[in-house]
UniProtKB/Swiss-Prot annotation:
Domain of life: Eukaryota
Gene Ontology annotations for the cellular component aspect, listed alphabetically: membrane
Pfam families (UniProt xref): DUF4149
Species this protein is from: Pongo abelii
The protein's name: Transmembrane protein 205
Gene: TMEM205
Length: 189
């Protein structure tokens, strides 16, 4: 580093580390850990673990998007943005928006809906099994068919869970496109 420091180089490193760290975390949580935990833990234990992890995950995603957006926005003259620079700012703003919606609105509602579902399931002796381990008729399907309250709770949970998943995939895609753009700008390895 030059005497007095190379602030531009440091900012670029922070931007790349935060963006790649956020994307790596998102890839792991989205495509690896959830599937492993779902197949390995009893249903209600899995829900408990996810209810503890997701608030941190969404808030960390939100914080990383905010840091990256601030770094990128402060490094460019707004009147002279190239298409790629404007696209990157848009993608980071989209990631920040989706992560914020997930952290502040969808996650608390999804978790509350999950607890309501689990309450009904526990009353019926369900939730202690590992998914895929049950032989015979599906007790959850039978419960849905017999209990309209449970069926409505389940629809509510899957509505919030589906919206949360879409927001999360939007963040993964936005950050992935930003990383791809940065990689394409590298002149040599």
């Amino acid at each position: 580093m030059e005497e007095g420091g190379n602030l531009g180089g440091l900012i670029k490193m922070v931007h790349l580390l935060v963006l790649s760290g956020a994307w790596g975390m998102q890839m792991w949580v989205t495509f690896v850990s959830g599937f492993l935990l779902f197949r390995s833990l009893p249903r209600h234990t899995f829900g408990l673990v996810q209810s503890k992890l997701f608030p941190f995950y969404f808030h960390i995603s939100m914080g990383c998007a905010f840091v990256n957006l601030c770094i990128l926005a402060s490094q460019h003259a707004w009147a002279q943005l190239t298409f790629w620079e404007a696209s990157q700012l848009y993608l980071l703003f989209l990631s920040l928006t989706l992560a914020t919606v997930n952290a502040r609105w969808l996650e608390p509602r999804t978790t509350a809906a999950m607890w309501a579902l689990q309450t009904v399931e526990k009353e019926r002796g369900l939730g202690g099994e590992v998914p895929g381990s049950h032989q015979g008729p599906d007790p959850y399907r039978q419960l849905r068919e017999k209990d309209p309250k449970y069926s409505a709770l389940r629809q509510n949970f899957f509505r919030y869970h589906g919206l949360s998943s879409l927001c999360n995939l939007g963040c993964v895609l936005s950050n992935g496109l930003c990383l791809a753009g940065l990689a394409l700008e590298i002149r040599s390895l």
